[in-house]
From Swiss-Prot:
Homodimer. Homohexamer; ring-shaped, necessary to form the nucleocapsid. Homopentamers; opened pentamers in solution. Binds to viral genomic RNA. Interacts with glycoprotein Gn; this interaction allows packaging of nucleocapsids into virions. The keyword Ribonucleoprotein applies. GO terms for cellular component: helical viral capsid; host cell endoplasmic reticulum-Golgi intermediate compartment; host cell Golgi apparatus; host cell nucleus; ribonucleoprotein complex; viral nucleocapsid. This is Nucleoprotein. Its main location: virion. RNA binds at residues 33, 36, 76, 114-115, 194. It comes from Uukuniemi virus (strain S23). The N-terminus is involved in homooligomerization. Encapsidates the genomic RNA, protecting it from nucleases. Displays high affinity for single-stranded nucleic acid. The encapsidated genomic RNA is termed the nucleocapsid (NC) or ribonucleoprotein. The ribonucleoprotein has a non-helical structure. Serves as template for viral transcription and replication. After replication, the nucleocapsid is recruited to the host Golgi apparatus by glycoprotein Gn for packaging into virus particles. InterPro entries: Capsid_Phlebovir/Tenuivir, Nucleocapsid_Phlebovirus.
Length: 254
């Protein structure tokens, strides 16, 4: 390849070069799959539900079933199947096939149980109070660390509901209270984390937390509405006592 003699002409030649639309679509897919786009996940769920000729109510039931499955059984499909009743296995097989579930996402539209839960953060956090006796980290465990710990914080989906327009001290309190759960969850599911310092564990998981906090899928007002419905903040954006207490416990550990 010869060196261009005129860089302006070279730039024009680049812009005039032809390409197939499929090439750009492949690039989008190639460079997007590591990220997470809730709209893509929801669109895929809707597409597959429509393909299965489901009603809206049936689709919503499926989403609730998938989130409950994730919250109580985790994300690894093979492990989940081994621990289900025969009736549960039949329902699981149906959902797995219908929504083409995978353990690990390789493309933007791939559906994992955790992606479905995070894309539906508001619903996930609404379901939590009903299932926290059956989760990896239970309500009683979190309350042993901080009395009246807010159960709606007990999944990493919660980070996507923190309104970035709240007063700075409220944001920090919500984040730190949520981090107390993330810390306990990491220690529970990852044996090697049990001997690590709290700050090391939190630092290792910080990128996922920051991605949730940076999510713009919901508007600040929509996020605030969820926080108000969970009674985590008041009309002035001030956090409640349980949140403040959990944040204080976390800070004492680091």
């Amino acid at each position: 390849m010869a060196m261009p003699e005129n860089w302006v002409r070279f730039a024009i030649e680049i812009s005039d070069a032809q390409w197939e639309e499929e090439e750009i679509r492949e690039f989008i897919n190639l460079f997007q799959y590591q990220g997470f786009d809730a709209a893509v996940v929801l669109s895929r769920i809707f597409e597959l539900a429509k393909k299965a000729d489901l009603s809206r109510d049936q689709m919503l039931r499926d989403i609730r079933a998938l989130i409950t499955l994730h919250l109580t059984r985790g994300n690894k499909l093979s492990s989940i199947e081994k621990r289900l009743s025969e009736e549960g296995k039949k329902e699981f097989a149906l959902l797995k096939a219908r929504y083409q579930l995978v353990d690990k996402a390789k493309e933007a539209a791939d559906l994992t149980l955790s992606r479905i839960a995070i894309a539906n953060a508001g619903l996930t956090c609404r379901i939590l109070p009903q299932v926290v006796a059956h989760t990896a980290v239970t309500r009683s465990r979190m309350e042993s660390l901080s009395a009246d710990y807010p159960v709606c914080m007990m999944h990493n989906a919660f980070a996507g509901l923190i309104d970035e327009t709240l007063p700075e001290d409220s944001i920090k309190a919500l984040v730190d209270a949520h981090r107390l759960y993330l810390l306990e969850f990491s220690r529970t599911i990852n044996v090697k984390h049990r001997g690590m310092e709290a700050k090391e564990i939190l630092d290792a998981n910080d990128s996922a937390l920051q991605a949730g906090l940076a999510s713009s899928f919901l508007t600040p007002s929509q996020k605030r509405a969820y926080l108000l419905s969970f009674k985590l903040v008041d009309g002035n954006g001030k956090v409640n006592k349980a949140v403040q207490q959990a944040a204080t416990v976390l800070r004492s550990l680091i």
